[in-house]
Amino acid sequence: MKKMIVLIGWAFLLSVTAALPSFAEENNTVGYGGSTTTAPDSYGHWVLSRDGSWSFISNDTGSPMYGWIVSKHQWYYIAANGRMVIGWQKINYETYYFSEKSVENQPLGSLYMNKFTPDNYRVDSKGIRAD
């Protein structure tokens, strides 16, 4: 029984750390447009609420997921209220920009990385505002 609890604990820790964003070394190329990642997709699906907001639901539990998620090679952030964020957001003392509308290679709500935002601010390879 004790081994089973330890095993479940390790499985939980591994699943939680796999969902945290990890970023590659920053390079000096800066463009405008899409940002993609090679991180594995989070195990869930998008649900559109009546108020027009999006939530990401876990396929395992059926509950909303919170924090950083990856969907179709894009980073998103789900707030504590279960809704996808858009626009400029302060997360853990850093400022990020999430697409306010779908544009070429940049879906609604996806994190801008190593680019200029539509309002012409630069974000680094981690998506953090550089200016």
Regions found by a protein language model. Give the residues of each.
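Extracellular adhesion/carbohydrate-binding repeat motifs centered on closely spaced tryptophans
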Residues: 4-131
